[in-house]
Amino acid sequence: NPAEQPLLQADGLGIRMAKRWLFRNLGFSLSRGDFLAVVGPSGSGKTTLLRSLTGELKSDEGSVRNLAQGLLPCGTIFQDLQLANGARAIQNALSGSLGRHGTLETLFGFPASEKSSSLELLERLGLADKGDQWTSTLSRGERQRLAIARTLLAAPRVLLADEPVASLDQDWANSVLSLLKEKQSQRKGALVCVLHDVEQVERHATHQLTLSEEESDGWSFRKV
């Protein structure tokens, strides 16, 4: 059954920082439609785990297998956002779709379909009137939502997000998490989010991974 085949799988994962193991023997697998919330105290290794899942950081033990097919199997939203401040908001959003088009295609501008998708996403994220503004003039919350639009336009099968709603109020946070779930479901993908709010985890996630600051093998994985 294709729906049951894992898109992302971690086996016996262990990462050490300085002389301390953040976690060891960590394992889970995510299939299409899954939303994994990663929780735990500060310093327990949540961001480090995300970096190892992208392949940016090599684990000291175990392995990560990204089995997603497509042009962009994995997309990320990190806390530093990595937006181009000297560009307009719409340009930052559209840059997410660059990987799906050749250089010649975008030499004289993006296809109309991409612009339409971008504007629709900006509207869903409350940025409809911000498209022509310089990114540097946006608030932190607006920039966070813009980074989300850019990553969604890249259409990754597996989306990894480090506290994607940290700068948003509760209403916007729930709207954004619902949007992420909706888009990943449409593309038969999976979602991994570092979250702090218990209510958000219970409302949106399908699975929860809890990391421990005290014990490297004190992590737990459960269905929500």
Which residue stretches match the model-derived regions?
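Conserved ABC ATPase signature
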Residues: W134-L138, E142
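H-loop/switch region of ABC-family ATPase nucleotide-binding domains
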Residues: L195-H196
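Catalytic Walker B motif of ABC-type/P-loop ATPase nucleotide-binding domains
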Residues: L159-D162
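Conserved ABC ATPase "signature" region
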Residues: T106-K130
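Conserved structural motif at the start of ABC-family nucleotide-binding domains
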Residues: L8, L22-N25
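Q-loop/switch helix immediately C-terminal to the Walker
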Residues: G86-E105
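Helix-to-loop junction immediately C-terminal to a conserved catalytic motif
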Residues: T54
